[in-house]
């Protein structure tokens, strides 16, 4: 950390605080949505948070032509002001205004990530260090953010958690304003070429069974994420007045993810043991989460669920990186990013149109389908490796 240059430190400080605010405000927004007494509003919170991801793959075209520091700066300022403004909106009133303001904040936020990644690539010798530290800071920020939100709620106001998020964005903007990088515009592909790249990514997914399996894994997990997010307010009711439970469950995201990341090397890649652990954990943890009336059991189920999701995410990314040409990977991940945002939104709406047993049955069918497809792909992977080794011997 001490070896980092000032620009790298400012970026890391700002993002750690901003990410902390994100996971402090997520449960707070879910709590505020329950005051409307309509689960479509709860689903709406998740949809407006996720659906802008569909457009993110095409934003690199704009980011490459504009000053990335200014994009990050103004995005954080806009988000900070709107979140502070949300605290003045009466609870349970004006649902369309509530969702519209959230859509503006998360919609503007999709410009931020491409700009941040581009800035990180300009940090020269600090690139590896900043990426490693950012990954660690992400997990810690989720845990600390959820804990901070819980403390605000115990202090008597869920709006404080929303205000805290607004403040973290403004503090992040302050650090970003101190980053000194010379802006060099890049003449990147136009919109038509961006769509062509997207189509090439789709073509690779269709023709490469390993990449198709990675995509299947990512969209399955996105559906599961949407379902679990939408059930946070319901499950939280089994603890007191139900509000503090949302923050505890958000804490489980970071804690489960931390454990899941540590288990990746032990469970292994492209083998049936890890696949079995992932499948069993996903189904059992989700069933417990949806049906148990005991909050402590729900917490354990949530941790197990997020362990499985972290493992699956790493597995899917590695499968793309190992089995697709380097020049096509960005296009594949662009398709994945858009699909994930769409599937989280779809999963979050199941609660409004399907009963819990039907949702669970649908998830079991999808996850079992993924299990069978992955098993076939793993077999192909082993056969390919064996052929490569035999050629090496001769």
UniProtKB/Swiss-Prot annotation:
Q: Could you tell me which Gene3D superfamilies the record lists for this protein? A: MFS general substrate transporter like domains
Gene Ontology molecular function terms on file: transmembrane transporter activity
Recorded topology in the membrane: Multi-pass membrane protein
Q: What InterPro entries does the record point to?
A: Bacilysin_exporter_BacE_put, MFS, MFS_trans_sf
- How is this protein annotated for GO cellular component? plasma membrane
Q: Where are the transmembrane segments?
A: 11-31, 43-63, 69-89, 92-112, 142-162, 166-186, 215-235, 244-264, 288-308, 332-352, 353-373
Subcellular location, principal: membrane
Q: Which domain of life is it from?
A: Bacteria
Which locations, inside or outside the cell, does it occupy?
Cell membrane
State the UniProt keywords alphabetically.
Cell membrane, Membrane, Transmembrane, Transmembrane helix, Transport
Q: Which family does it belong to?
A: Belongs to the major facilitator superfamily. Drug:H(+) antiporter-3 (DHA3) (TC 2.A.1.21) family.
Function noted in UniProt: Part of the bacilysin biosynthesis operon. May be involved in self-resistance to bacilysin by permitting efflux of this antibiotic.
Tell me more from the record.
Answer: The compound ppGpp is essential for the transcription of the bacABCDE operon and GTP regulates the transcription of both this operon and ywfH via the CodY-mediated regulation system.
Report the protein name in the record: Putative bacilysin exporter BacE
């Amino acid at each position: 950390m001490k070896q980092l240059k000032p620009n790298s430190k400012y970026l890391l400080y700002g993002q750690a605080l901003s990410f902390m605010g994100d996971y402090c405000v997520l449960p707070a927004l879910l709590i505020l949505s329950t005051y409307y007494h309509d689960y479509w509003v709860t689903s709406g919170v998740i949809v407006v948070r996720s659906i802008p991801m569909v457009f993110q793959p095409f934003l690199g075209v704009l980011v490459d032509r504009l000053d990335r520091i200014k994009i990050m700066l103004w995005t954080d300022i806009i988000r900070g002001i709107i979140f502070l403004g949300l605290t003045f909106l009466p609870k349970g009133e004006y649902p369309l205004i509530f969702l519209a303001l959230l859509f503006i904040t998360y919609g503007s936020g999709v410009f931020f990530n491409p700009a941040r990644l581009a800035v990180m690539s300009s940090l020269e010798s600090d690139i590896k260090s900043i990426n490693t530290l950012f990954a660690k800071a992400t997990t810690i920020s989720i845990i600390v953010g959820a804990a901070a939100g819980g403390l605000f709620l115990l202090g008597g106001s869920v709006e404080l958690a929303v205000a805290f998020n607004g403040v973290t964005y403004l503090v992040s903007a302050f650090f970003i304003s101190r980053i000194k990088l010379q802006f060099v515009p890049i003449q990147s592909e136009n919109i038509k070429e961006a769509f062509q790249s997207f189509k090439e990514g789709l073509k690779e997914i269709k023709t490469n069974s390993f990449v198709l399996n990675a995509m299947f894994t990512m969209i399955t997990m996105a559906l599961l994420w949407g379902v679990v997010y939408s059930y946070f307010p319901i499950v939280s009711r089994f603890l007191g007045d139900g509000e503090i439970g949302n923050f505890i469950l958000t804490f489980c995201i970071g804690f489960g993810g931390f454990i899941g990341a540590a288990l990746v090397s032990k469970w292994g890649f492209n083998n049936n043991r890890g696949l079995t652990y992932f499948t069993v954990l996903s189904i059992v943890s989700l069933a417990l989460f949806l049906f148990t009336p005991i909050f402590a059991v729900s917490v354990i189920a949530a941790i197990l669920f997020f362990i499985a999701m972290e493992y699956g995410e790493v597995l899917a990314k590695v499968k793309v990186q190992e089995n697709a040409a380097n020049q096509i990977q960005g296009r594949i991940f662009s398709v994945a990013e858009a699909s994930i945002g769409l599937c989280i939104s779809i999963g979050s709406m199941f609660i409004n149109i399907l009963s819990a047993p039907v949702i669970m049955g649908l998830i079991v069918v999808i996850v079992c389908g993924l299990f069978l497809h992955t098993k076939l792909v793993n077999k192909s992977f082993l056969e390919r490796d064996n052929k490569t080794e035999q050629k090496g011997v001769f």
